[in-house]
Amino acid sequence: MHTPVVFIDGDQGTTGLQIHARLQGRSDLRLLTLPEAERKDPQRRCEAINSADIALLCLPDDAAREAVAAIHNPQVRVIDASSAHRTTPGWVYGLPELDEQQAERIAQSTRVSNPGCYPTGAIALLHPLVKAGLLPADYPLNIHAVSGYSGGGRAAVERHEQPGAAKAPALQLYGLELAHKHVPEIQQHAGLSARPMFMPGYGAYRQGIALSIPLQLRLLPGQVSAEHLQACLEQHYQGARHVQVMPLHQCGAAANLDPEALNGSNDLRLALYANPEHGQVLLTAVFDNLGKGASGAAVQNLDLMLGALQAHG
């Protein structure tokens, strides 16, 4: 029986290292790795990609596009962890929980784009509500998110953790030009007709995301209530292994959101906070930016693709 060969192009970056750690020791696949001296050799990388059953690209956007262009073996399947192909026609979006058919689309695909960290939480909250008609596609959305500094990649981790490093600011807001590259991804896969505002920031901790989206009930159609929104999310994610929707009554009793609560896992926790008196609702998501927001999602997609590959020979 053929053992699938998996090659991680960019296995020394933050996401690549995490994927490698998650796959190491598995007997159902063979990890193809290049010697350190050959990792940046274009010819050796091209040979490795074209000899793999599945290639995981953990590269900057331009390098990911070049890697895909270098594939001449039609049997090679790709999971791209960069943002290069997340809105590209012909690529399947790698969020298995997007709808009932998405996991099967991923399983059968030859080109899968791994979701961005922030979009994972935003789309998971918004897509079911827009699809159900509870949230207008042109709602003037404001998305707020704080991530650990590992969201800035390997250079950011080294900058914060090297000996003698200056103390990091408690919070660093960025993307203030309102042109963050994740916005088109969020808009397309959440089904939005109006561009949302997105305000990200890095906290002085290593990893974990807390994302929130405020809603005014008076701007929703008909008599949509917090209970309607809650029921929609619960129904959409019923049976989802890696997505947990917190009960509404528990949310009301919670004092805060801990962005580090799910670190090390591939889980996503959604919660809805409501104040009926003020007619306001807060949608929230907590997850590991290196887990469900990156490497965990990539391995989840890989497992879906391996299942299809093994089932079909």
Swiss-Prot record:
Single GO molecular function: NAD binding
Reaction it catalyzes: N-acetyl-L-glutamate 5-semialdehyde + phosphate + NADP(+) = N-acetyl-L-glutamyl 5-phosphate + NADPH + H(+)
BP terms from Gene Ontology: L-arginine biosynthetic process
Pfam families noted in UniProt: Semialdhyde_dh, Semialdhyde_dhC_1
Superkingdom to which the source organism belongs: Bacteria
InterPro entries: AGPR_AS, AGPR_type-2, NAD(P)-bd_dom_sf, NAGSA_dehydrogenase, Semialdehyde_DH_NAD-bd
Function: Catalyzes the NADPH-dependent reduction of N-acetyl-5-glutamyl phosphate to yield N-acetyl-L-glutamate 5-semialdehyde.
Protein name, entry field: N-acetyl-gamma-glutamyl-phosphate reductase 2
Gene encoding the protein: argC2
